[in-house]
A protein has these predicted regions:
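Metal-dependent active-site segment of extracytoplasmic phospho-/sulfohydrolases and closely related
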Residues: 1, 165-200
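Active-site rim elements
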Residues: 44-47, 154-163, 174-175
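A solvent-exposed, charged loop/short amphipathic helix patch at secondary-structure junctions
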Residues: 140-160
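Non-membrane alpha-helical structural segments and their capping/turn regions in soluble enzymes
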Residues: 108, 160-167
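Residue-level detector of functional hotspots within protein domains
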Residues: 24, 149, 154, 172, ...
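Active-site-proximal alpha/beta segments of enzymes that process anionic O-linked groups
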Residues: 1-146
């Protein structure tokens, strides 16, 4: 019942170039194993070893793109996870902070990093946000507190507010890309869903 994706809703209704996939599912329930499978040829059906799998940055580079990876999820340990290993293969890799903790920086901290992208090149950019990850009430600034929280700080209202903030962020990325970077395509997906009563 929450109108927490107004920009996406408008684009869905008014822009024939936008494609939305309903009933999408994740290949796993946690970030690292999901992105291993979503961003490489490894998948839940054959479970090819990650280190033997081409990833999306490998493919983009082979196609002649200059690659960038910007993340608000922390480094995790530079060589400790598949995500960090994949990110480090980009031509440019930047994190909003250099450790893994649930970020105290809002995802908009990634927006200035887009200004470092050379618009004269063919660019492939991965932007890894915190989005609506647990501790939803920590994921958005006060001005996005549209719905008053109930008795639980990580309940539906906080989750809806975090979705509203992500919707705004996507609009900023899209607008900047169209105006400054010759944006040709943009894909957004959540790496996994959330069970609000279990916080994951």
């Amino acid at each position: 019942p929450y109108d927490d994706t107004p920009w996406q809703g408008t684009m869905r209704a008014d822009n024939k170039d936008f494609v939305f996939f309903d009933n999408a599912y994740s290949s796993y329930v946690q970030t690292v194993p999901t992105l291993e499978r979503a961003l490489s040829e490894r998948n839940q059906y054959d479970d090819k070893p990650f280190l033997d799998s081409a990833n999306i940055l490998d493919v983009a580079k082979k196609a002649g793109y200059t690659t960038s990876w910007f993340s608000n999820q922390g480094v995790f340990g530079e060589y400790d996870t598949a995500i960090s290993l994949m990110a480090k293969t980009a031509d440019t890799t930047k994190w909003s902070h250099e450790s893994y903790a649930f970020s105290d920086r809002y995802d908009e901290s990634l927006l200035p990093l887009l200004q470092s992208v050379d618009p004269s090149k063919n660019n492939f950019i991965v932007i890894h946000i915190m989005g609506s990850h647990i501790y939803y009430n920590d994921r958005y600034p006060h001005e996005f507190s549209k719905w008053k929280q109930g008795p639980y700080p990580d309940g539906q209202e906080a989750y809806a507010n975090s979705q509203l903030y992500t919707d705004w962020l996507l609009q900023q990325i899209y607008t900047y890309g169209k105006e400054k970077l010759n944006l040709q395509a943009m894909v957004y997906f959540s790496d996994h869903g959330e069970s609000l009563d279990k916080s994951h």
